Regions:
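N-terminal presequence-like segments and the immediate start of the first folded domain
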Residues: 1-59, 63-76, 82-128
Length: 128
């Protein structure tokens, strides 16, 4: 698989994501449903703590990727839904630490509410 970042305006690169990712020669595509801060039994965790919810949502995303034989390095698109979009942007260091040098296309969407006590939900598309 070949990934080519598309950034006609480079300001997003410093934030750790690309405006678009052109993927060629991939074999499989995994489309992940929204992942949030739940434990293995589906019970909501970390009410009121955006950072902890984001970390656990990433853990859950990584578990799905691993079950498909993939890692965060295979993610080409990450949609972030949050009850406070500005707070998520302030927490981008968490995403950058987990994704490392792997950049992806992303949208951060502020939403009025999420189920249960969730503050953030992640949807991902991964390819290999």
């Amino acid at each position: 698989m070949q990934r080519t970042p598309i950034n006609p305006h480079a300001w997003t690169v410093g934030l750790g994501f690309d405006q678009a990712v052109l993927v060629e020669g991939h074999r499989r595509m995994l489309v992940c449903s929204g992942q949030d801060a739940v434990d293995a039994n589906g019970a909501p965790q970390h009410p009121g703590d955006m950072a902890a919810q984001l970390e656990l949502a990433l853990d859950n995303l990584e578990a799905i990727l691993a079950a498909a034989g993939m890692t965060l390095a295979h993610v080409v698109r990450l949609n972030v839904y949050a009850t406070d979009a500005d707070e998520v942007i302030r927490r981008f260091a968490i995403l950058n630490a987990r994704f490392g040098s792997n950049r992806y296309a992303t949208s951060v969407l502020g939403v009025a509410s999420l189920p249960a006590q969730f503050m953030v939900m992640l949807e991902a598309t991964a390819v290999d």
